[in-house]
């Protein structure tokens, strides 16, 4: 009889512990707020995938390959990402191509000072253009046209003019084929160009539509200053 009582006590204790465990799990499930996926500041950026052109050929691109999930604010070693949604027949994209290329070269540390060191000494910022085809009459793009726009080569036409004659130098950042609008729809992009700054952990840090008075470079400088990531002169 004594043995049965002890067994009952042990069973009862185990049941109570198990019950407390499940209560704790349920509590965490209801009190932990997962970061929402979206394109507003503070949200986790949606997936961005496709075949990319890097100047030499087309290879697979996955934005997750650029992310560092354990990155923390203030860590200067993390690599940031600027995403541009564009259309090779978009006149505004053509207008911005020169300045955007210069900004990309600066923050990607391609631009050099007279002594040969990078002009920008802060965190590395990678740039990617997701090239789509808007549902607008006269907007017809192709991989050949994307290459022509990026490299300023070939005889493809961009917005009625030769792509090779657009303002600025050839771009050094990658272009992703989004002709089918898959990325554009995933990100709910209303029009082009649209710009986003993504933190190393994949969180949206800046959206141009929320800061129309700022350019991409302004947004980067402000964010780096706020996070203590501006290099010492």
Where are these regions (language model features)?
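N-terminal targeting signals for export/organelle localization
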Residues: 1-61, 206
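A short beta-strand-turn-helix
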Residues: 47-81
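Sec/Tat-exported extracytoplasmic proteins
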Residues: 52, 86-89, 104-111, 224-228
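Extracellular/periplasmic catalytic domains that process cell-envelope and extracellular macromolecules
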Residues: 74-77, 119-122, 167-169, 188-191
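Short pre-active-site segment immediately N-terminal to redox-active cysteine/selenocysteine motifs
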Residues: 78-81, 86-89, 134, 191
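Thiol/disulfide oxidoreductase modules built on the thioredoxin-like
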Residues: 166-171, 176-228
